[in-house]
Curated annotation (Swiss-Prot):
Organism whose genome encodes this protein: Zinnia elegans
One BP term from GO: regulation of secondary cell wall biogenesis
Membrane association type: Single-pass membrane protein
Record-annotated membrane-spanning stretches: 4-24
Protein name: Protein TRACHEARY ELEMENT DIFFERENTIATION-RELATED 6
């Protein structure tokens, strides 16, 4: 019984340490990316407005107008990472 308990505790500790190592690696990658890369946030918005007008004739011969407005709005967040690279020119002229 004690052996089973020790085995499960050992595997649990290894599992928790593995998750902690994975999270630490992800944080380090994110920190390096944010330090070396300039982020440009772009927001792309699509808006479509459709108006439908329906004229219906009622039972008394009276006309009824029904207007339906469909507003379709899409917002897309796009992040572009552009590396901060400096382009240097090599000087090959002789003095």
């Amino acid at each position: 019984m004690a052996t089973i308990f020790i085995v499960f505790v050992s595997f649990g500790c290894v599992f928790v340490l593995g998750i902690a190592a994975f999270v630490l690696c992800c944080l380090i990658k994110k920190w390096k990316c944010s330090k070396a890369i300039e982020k440009n946030e772009m927001v792309h918005v699509d808006q479509h407005l459709q108006v439908h007008e329906n004229i219906l004739q009622g039972p008394n011969g009276m006309k009824t107008v029904a207007i339906t407005v469909d507003d379709d709005l899409h917002v897309h967040d796009e992040e572009e990472c552009v590396k901060n690279e400096k382009l240097g020119t090599a000087s090959t002229s002789k003095a």
